[in-house]
Amino acid sequence: MEPLTHPLLDEATVSQLRATLLADETSWQDGRKTAGYQAAEVKNNLQLDRNSKTAKENSQLVIKQLESDPLVKSFALPRHIHGVMFSRSGIGQGYGMHVDNAYMSSGRSDLSFTLFLNEPESYEGGALCIQTLQDSKQVKLPAGQVIIYPSTSLHAVETVTAGERLVCVGWIQSYISSNEDRTILFGLNAGARALLAEHGRSPELDLIFQAYTNLLRRLGS
Ligand SMILES: [Fe+2]
């Protein structure tokens, strides 16, 4: 399954969010506290304490945005968005190659997301690297844009060499655990929605939406 990159927060929202996070001087802690056993050895960053007021309020904001975005809904079919964390990496910090835990105390990870919160020009290094079969896809998006990718992927964060990288990461438990099934459903839904936008409702389109909905019911969990 190909990752989805998508604008999620507008400029005003992202700059307000960034200011709120950085104004909290007491809640940032060593990222190794939240890593699984395989990841702890390769994790090197700062994370906002999930129990802090700043983290709770702002993770809700991100979850609401993801849940209300039609493209994200169609792509990820989210049942539960969880484990949301704010992370900052300064010079010398990164996150080595790893795979995210399949099950966390907060839910199953079918899809992982990284929402970039500062502009790519403000830091060097810090790209999210997603391993493909023979290559590695490097991703560094403008502030407010999110990438959603299968949690089955090996991935890393390049070491930051200048400035500071600020992101929000989290996981999606999808109604559809299989990447392949989710990809098929996404294509069907995208095609039907495009037909609806172009030609309006029709009995034929009703049949396609019916098949889509019943396929989702059959494959979902
Ligand atoms: Fe990860």
Swiss-Prot record:
Q: Which residues bind 2-oxoglutarate?
A: 165
What the record notes about the co-factor is: Binds 1 Fe(2+) ion per subunit.
Which prosthetic group or cofactor does it need?
Fe(2+); L-ascorbate
Q: Which UniProt keywords apply?
A: Dioxygenase, Iron, Metal-binding, Oxidoreductase, Vitamin C
An example of a Gene Ontology BP annotation on this entry?
Answer: DNA damage response
EC number(s): the record gives 1.14.11.-
Top-level taxon of the source organism? Bacteria
In which residues is Fe cation bound? 98, 100, 155
Q: Which residues form the Fe2OG dioxygenase domain?
A: 80-174
Record flagged with keyword Transcription: no
Which GO molecular function entries does the Swiss-Prot or TrEMBL record give?
2-oxoglutarate-dependent dioxygenase activity; iron ion binding; L-ascorbic acid binding
Q: Does the keyword Oxidoreductase apply?
A: yes
Do you know which PROSITE patterns this protein is assigned to? Answer: FE2OG_OXY
* Alphabetical list of InterPro entries matching this protein: Oxoglu/Fe-dep_dioxygenase_dom, PKHD_hydroxylase, Pro_4_hyd_alph, Pro_4_hyd_alph_FE2OG_OXY
Which spans are transmembrane here? none
**Which PANTHER family does UniProt cross-reference here?**
PKHD-TYPE HYDROXYLASE YBIX
Protein name per Swiss-Prot or TrEMBL: PKHD-type hydroxylase PMT_0286
